[in-house]
């Protein structure tokens, strides 16, 4: 039996409207009451995820910004790995002149965007988290957990992915969390490596973990865990990368809570 359960949020545990269903909430409460360790493992910001956790009234570790931040059961920061200042600073302005691509910055407890995009707020049904606008060149590049780019066109983000990888190589970890969101963290940062650290803290190893995800930013975690489950609605790129992993249902069908109940509560 896996003693640690790690799950991504958007596209995985959350419903398509970015909320936790009553069924999912009840499942997590039952699971943690049984002594199973639940871990949020997401690209979201820790301020946002902390509110989701507190609303659930459960104790859980939080892996946020795709592994660049880890908080313990009491919300204390126990791990942080920031982008190098020079890289963060350059990323702030790399596509500033492209009106189709929005640049987002997670810096310590803050969220910045280079221009208004009200539709981004659709992700915040379970928490209150507001962005501030920034000007490239005026934002201090210290404490940046990730920079991410959103665009309605996946095709526009592909050359950006290639350019960032070509320029900085293993100093960065670049991945698509969704087809319309390209995320950049420091090299060596991933949900998988963060999960390894959390499992160790809890007295377990990766083989004692089961993980759920749907994006390329989940790839390391799904392959490193004792068992990785890919959502049915996941990127084809992820399914092709790990054909050995089990594909389950979709977040629209509450596939993760159903799977967890079958595994732990039936």
Swiss-Prot record:
Annotated catalysed reactions: pyridoxal 5'-phosphate + H2O = pyridoxal + phosphate; sugar phosphate + H2O = sugar + phosphate
Cofactor note text: Magnesium. Can also use other divalent metal cations as manganese, cobalt or zinc.
GO function terms (MF aspect): magnesium ion binding; metal ion binding; phosphatase activity; pyridoxal phosphatase activity; sugar-phosphatase activity
List of catalytic residues: 8
Entry EC no(s): 3.1.3.74, 3.1.3.23
GO BP, sorted A to Z: response to stress
Main function: Catalyzes Strongly the dephosphorylation of pyridoxal-phosphate (PLP) and moderately the dephosphorylation of 2-deoxyglucose 6-phosphate (2bGLU6P) and beta-glucose 6-phosphate (bGlu6P). Also hydrolyzes both purines (GMP and IMP) and pyrimidines as secondary substrates.
Name the UniProt record assigns to this protein: Pyridoxal phosphate phosphatase YigL
Annotated source species: Escherichia coli (strain K12)
């Amino acid at each position: 039996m896996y003693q640690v359960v790690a799950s991504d949020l958007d596209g995985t545990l959350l419903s398509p409207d970015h909320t936790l269903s009553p069924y999912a909430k009840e499942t997590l409460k039952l699971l943690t009451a049984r002594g199973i360790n639940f871990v949020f493992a997401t690209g979201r910001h820790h301020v946002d995820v902390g509110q989701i956790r507190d609303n659930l009234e459960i104790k859980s570790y939080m892996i946020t910004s795709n592994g660049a931040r880890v908080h313990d059961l009491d919300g204390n920061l126990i791990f942080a790995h920031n982008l190098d200042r020079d890289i963060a600073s350059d990323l702030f302005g790399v596509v500033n002149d492209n009106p189709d691509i929005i640049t987002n910055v997670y810096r310590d407890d803050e969220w910045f965007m280079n221009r208004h995009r009200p539709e981004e707020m659709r992700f915040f049904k379970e928490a209150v988290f507001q962005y501030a606008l920034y000007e490239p060149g005026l934002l201090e590049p210290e404490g940046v957990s990730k920079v991410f780019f959103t665009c309605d066109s996946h095709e526009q983000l592909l050359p950006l992915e290639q350019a960032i990888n070509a320029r900085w190589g293993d100093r960065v970890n670049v991945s698509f969390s969704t087809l319309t969101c390209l995320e950049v963290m420091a090299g060596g940062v991933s949900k998988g490596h963060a999960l390894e650290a959390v499992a160790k803290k809890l007295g377990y190893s990766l083989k004692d973990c089961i993980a759920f995800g749907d994006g390329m930013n989940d790839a390391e975690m799904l392959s490193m865990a004792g068992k990785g489950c890919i959502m049915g609605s996941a990127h084809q790129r992820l399914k092709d990368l790990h054909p050995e992993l089990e594909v389950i249902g979709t977040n629209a069908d509450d596939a993760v809570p159903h799977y967890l109940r079958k595994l732990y509560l039936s």
